[in-house]
């Protein structure tokens, strides 16, 4: 069977796990799932292999802090596959680092909290994309997706979070400009507030919802829609409306009003570019001590 070949980073938990699971289990793809936690990846692979799906998870233990290890992974992939259809950059260490410091200004946080949002998140996405780009350029096709957040548009948790997410949004935009002549797309996905192994936002989206959003872009979006979204940010909830999918409970977790509010915000000049824009008030943001309750699982993981 000619399965589509995909790579999903950060696939041991959270959005990455949900995306890898849906691609393999619901879409029948062969997914090279990367993370540091090999045991969690093996559990994911077993879940797919024991289902009635034709898809496959290939567990790939990988520390994306190690550039040479990433190069070795890409080279190994290329010896096994003659093409890559999809790269999803989902690995992110920031929330685990941020959780113990909710409510603090940036100067009271360790520098390592800032680094966590940029190293495994922004930088790791750039490195992985740069190493897979030649393969996509050569085959004149492929899709790169960065998993980001509305925190790239509006102040949420802290300075590092915003800088990292804004960087991911811009990463897709600038990569798309250079990849466009070669038939390769780069798009940023914004999930809504989520319920994962780390986070527990009320009525939040599950990682399966993001998985279905990614699958829609891979298997359902036509060339016109991909060109419209190329280099842009799209919300998972917007894709759910376009391609008629729901979360695992049969619901649309992020409502139409919230989705529209976020889209309006994304369509307006960012505060740094508008002299008329008011600065955000951190006391009314998610940078508050009580917000740590939304990260109950953070204590179970290391950055």
Name every feature range the model reports, one short phrase each.
Residues 129-130, 173:
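A short, exposed helix-loop element centered on a Lys and neighboring polar residues
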Residues 188-189, 200-302:
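C-terminal helical subdomain
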Residues 48-67:
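Rossmann-fold cofactor-recognition segment
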Residues 90-102:
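Conserved NAD(P)H cofactor-binding loop of Rossmann-fold oxidoreductase domains
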Residues 26-43:
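Conserved glycine-rich Rossmann-like NAD(P)H-binding loop of the short-chain dehydrogenase/reductase
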Residues 93-94, 105-113, 117, 143-173, ...:
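Catalytic loop of short-chain dehydrogenase/reductase
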Residues 12-14:
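Conserved glycine-rich cofactor-binding loop
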């Amino acid at each position: 069977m000619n399965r589509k070949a995909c790579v999903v980073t950060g696939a041991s938990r959270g959005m990455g796990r949900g995306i890898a699971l849906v691609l393999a289990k619901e879409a029948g793809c062969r997914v090279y799932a990367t993370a540091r936690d090999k045991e969690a990846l093996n559990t994911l692979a077993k879940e797919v292999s024991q289902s009635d799906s034709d898809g496959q998870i290939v567990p790939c233990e990988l520390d994306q802090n190690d550039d040479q290890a990433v190069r070795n992974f890409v080279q190994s992939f290329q010896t096994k596959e003659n093409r890559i259809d999809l790269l999803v950059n989902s690995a992110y260490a920031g929330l685990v680092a941020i959780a113990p410091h909710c409510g603090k200004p940036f100067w009271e946080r360790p520098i390592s909290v800032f680094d966590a949002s940029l190293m495994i998140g922004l930088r790791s996405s750039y490195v992985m994309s740069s190493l897979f780009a030649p393969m996509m350029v050569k085959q004149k096709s492929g899709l790169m997706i960065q998993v980001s957040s509305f925190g790239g548009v509006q102040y949420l948790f802290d300075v590092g979070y915003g800088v990292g997410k804004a960087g991911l949004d811009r990463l897709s935009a600038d990569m798309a400009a250079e990849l466009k002549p070669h038939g390769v797309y780069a798009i940023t996905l914004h999930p809504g507030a989520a319920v994962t192994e780390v986070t527990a936002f009320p009525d939040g989206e599950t990682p399966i919802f993001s998985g279905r959003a990614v699958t829609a872009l891979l298997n359902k979006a036509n060339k016109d829609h991909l060109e419209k979204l190329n280099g842009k940010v799209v919300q998972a909830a917007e894709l759910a409306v376009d391609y008629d999918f729901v979360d695992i409970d049969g619901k649309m977790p992020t409502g139409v009003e919230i989705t529209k509010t976020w889209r309006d915000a994304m369509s307006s000049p960012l505060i740094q570019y508008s002299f008329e824009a008011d600065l955000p008030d951190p006391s009314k943001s998610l940078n508050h001590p009580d917000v740590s309750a939304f990260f109950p699982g953070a204590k179970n993981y290391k950055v």
